[in-house]
Amino acid sequence: MSFSPLKGIRVLDLTSVVVGPVCTWRLGQYGAEIIKIESPDGDLMRGLGGLSPTGQHSGTYLHLNRGKRNICLDLKKADTRDILDRLIASADVIVANMRPQALKKLALDSETIRGKFPDKVYCLITGYGTEGPYSGQPTYDSVVQGVTGMTGLFLRRDGSPSYVPMLICDHVAGEIAAGAILAAMMERNNTGVGSSIEVPMFETMAAFVLQEHMAQQSFEPPVGPAGDLRLLSPQNKPVETADGWIAFTINTNAQVRAFLSVTGRESLLEDERFNSVSARAKNVVEWFQVRGAPLKNKTSEQWLELLQGADIAAQPCHTLETLAQDKHLKSVGLIDHEQHPTEGKTAVIRASIKVDEQYLLPREFAQPKGWETAQLLKELGYSENEVNTMIGNGSALVASS
């Protein structure tokens, strides 16, 4: 039996792009029914996330919108208000990532919805929250990377700022929002009362950065400069071998001794600069020059055999082209394939969580825009004639055949 603790919970998904879809995707992995409301223009990520056979289901969109029932509504049309009201009444959780002022205009804000339905769990994911001088400003992942100082970490280490080439802020904030919703559902089970949750991306990621890099500035008076000097070392990077690069980390005294022995640097075993955790912290620059030095006298495979044999955490540095072919990922079946109704054969990335010795099963394919519009309208109590009228006047749209 599949692990589905949220079975019977309906989530109304008013989100788009990445951060919100990550949140609702996670809830869907736990068995919740996700109803994704999409505008006639469609979720921006359908095209923005890369090329696809039809131009309507980028890889990113496919992977983050699995298991969601898609209804397409033109919220500018007056008769969609009743549809929204019925959807809200039927839902347990509402998730939105529009700007607060836009939600207020559509009467889709937490105050309005929970004023009518105090048992609802409402989660708003924003760039900057509903307070403070940045509130209401637009943002995207790269902007959050900049304003949180993530780009400044590269400036400090490499001499120029850079973005992490992943939508890391969206993914982190989305997962945190999902966790907050799960906690709110536990509270509702105990009290019968819902919650209004707010997850601002800026504060969320600023806290992540500061938890690691406030470092010596965490004390009054400070005991040193800001920044984890290990992580900010220019030598803290993959190490070059005879035929590529490998990644490894050595932290404990036992790991350091094993590393120095395996790499033929036994002369440093008694060096007082490196013979304890505190000594290496005081001499972090010199230590990282040692551990970051190239290992070009052997191939990556040879070094990995030696390092792993010494119980040192070490693995190859994959490229985007080689990652999916990793022997471990292939063995555990992280990636599979299925037939999509409009895109043909597509990759399926299952959830990485294992419960009671079983991985969570992948949900259904990401649906074309309006795929279940008619079906959901009927489930909400509209007659066949009413459904046809709403489709005919453009209030509701169905997927093209």
Where are these regions (language model features)?
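N-terminal helix-loop segment corresponding to the beta1-alpha1 unit
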Residues: M1-N190, P368, A374-S401
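Terminal low-complexity tails and localization/encapsulation signals of metabolic enzymes
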Residues: M1-R10, G224, P234, E240-T241, ...
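Short, well-structured beta-strand/strand-turn elements
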Residues: I34, Q308-T322, S383-N388
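Glycine-rich beta-alpha junction loops
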Residues: D41, Y128-G129, M201-A206, D243-W245, ...
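Active-site-adjacent beta-strand anchor residues
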Residues: D74, A96, V199, F248-I250
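Conserved Rossmann-fold dehydrogenase catalytic segment
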Residues: T130, D158-M166, N189-M205, G224-L231, ...
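Oxidoreductase and adenylate-handling cofactor-binding alpha/beta cores
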Residues: L155, G174-G194, A207-Q217, L260-E266
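Aromatic-enriched alpha-helical interface/lid elements that frame and gate functional surfaces
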Residues: L229-R230, P234-A310, A314, S400
